[in-house]
Amino acid sequence: MEIPKDEKIKFLKELVEIYSPTGKEEEAAKFIKEKLEEYGVKAYIDKVGNVIGVKEGEGPLILLAGHVDTVPGYIPVRIEGDILWGRGSVDAKGPLSALLFAMVESNANVIFAGLVDEEGFSKGARALDVPRPEYVIVGEPSGVNGVTIGYKGSLTVRFVERVEKFHGSIGGGAAEKLIERWLSISGNFEDGFNGLSGRIVRFVAYERDFEFYGEMIVNLRTPPGYEPPRDWDIIDFVPAYEVNRRSPLVRTFVRSIRELGMKPKLKKKSGTADMNILAPRFGVDAVAYGPGDSRLDHTPYERISLMEYLQSIDVLKNVLTKLKGKDLDKIYKSSPR
C-alpha cells in the first residue's frame, strides 16, 4: 500500500495538534488506533494505554516502538514552508509517524507500539505485552542519516539529612550536608558517553522544632557498567544500553541510508530512551531511529523538516525490506567494519 505524501504530512500535523503530555495520551492513542484500522492493520489499546498495531507479513518479527506522550509546554502548531512546528514534532511524534507509515507501506512482519509515559517512568515500555521480536527499532530523533546505537542510563536517587538542632553560630545543618554530598558526586562527572553526568531535580531544606531537615533528589546519567552504591535510596534506575555496531540490524540501517544517497552516522546519546528497557527485556538487538534534531527536544523551538520526515520513511521501508526473510548473520559475516 502506497500512501500519498500529503496524507503522511496531514497525519503528522494532526497528531502533533493533539496535545498529549505524559498522563494525557488517551486522545492521541485513539487517533493512531483509528488510522491503523483505516489502513487495514489490526489495532487495540492495551491495559496501560499503549496503542498496538499488528501486521502479519514476511520474515522475522520486528517491533517498531515509539512514544505517544510529550513533555509539557504547548507550542502552536503551524507549517512554515518545509517546517512543522509543535510540541512532539521531534520528540517523538515525527519518528512515531515514520514508523507507522513504514509498516503500512511494507509487507514485513511487524508489531507497532505507540507507548505511553516515556517522558515519565516508561510505564508503557515496562508493561508492553507482545510476542518476542527478532529486532527492535525505537522511534527517536537521530536525524534522517543517523542511527542511535547507545543511550546512557538514568538513575534517580533521593538523599535525606536530619540534623539535631543547634545554634546557628556553630555551623552547617542538613542543607550543607546535602551540598557536600552533591559536590562529592559531581566531582566524578566526566564528559562523553562513558562518563557520569547529572543534575539536581529537587532540593528543599527547612527547620523543624528540634531538627534541621533537608531532602535532595538527583538524576544521574550513567555510563555502561555503572552500578550505584547499595545504600542509596534509589527511586528509579534504567541502566545504559549499547548495541554492537557489527549487529546485522545496525549494518542494515547503514546500508539502507547509503543506498538513499546519504552518509550514515552512528550515534551514542547522553539521554535515556525506551530502547534501554525494551532491548534487555526481549534480549535482542535494538537501535533508535527517526527524523528530527534531538537538540530541539523539550525546547520552545521544537520543529521538524517535513522533507526529512518523508525521507526517514523511505529509510525505514528499505530497512524492513532488507530484514525480511534473510539470514543477515551470513550476509554480513565477512563484511568490513
Swiss-Prot record:
Can you provide one Gene Ontology molecular function annotated for this UniProt record? zinc ion binding
Q: Which keywords does UniProt give here?
A: Amino-acid biosynthesis, Arginine biosynthesis, Cobalt, Cytoplasm, Hydrolase, Lysine biosynthesis, Metal-binding, Zinc
Q: Where does the source fall among the domains of life?
A: Archaea
State which pathway it belongs to: Amino-acid biosynthesis; L-lysine biosynthesis via AAA pathway; L-lysine from L-alpha-aminoadipate (Thermus route): step 5/5; Amino-acid biosynthesis; L-arginine biosynthesis
Q: Does the keyword Zinc-finger apply?
A: no
Q: Which residues bind Zn(2+) 2?
A: 91, 119, 298
Q: How is the cofactor bound?
A: Binds 2 Zn(2+) or Co(2+) ions per subunit.
Q: Which reaction does it catalyse?
A: [amino-group carrier protein]-C-terminal-gamma-(L-lysyl)-L-glutamate + H2O = [amino-group carrier protein]-C-terminal-L-glutamate + L-lysine; [amino-group carrier protein]-C-terminal-gamma-(L-ornithyl)-L-glutamate + H2O = [amino-group carrier protein]-C-terminal-L-glutamate + L-ornithine
What's the name of the protein? Putative [LysW]-lysine/[LysW]-ornithine hydrolase
Starting at the broadest rank, the lineage of the source organism is:
Archaea, Methanobacteriati, Methanobacteriota, Thermococci, Thermococcales
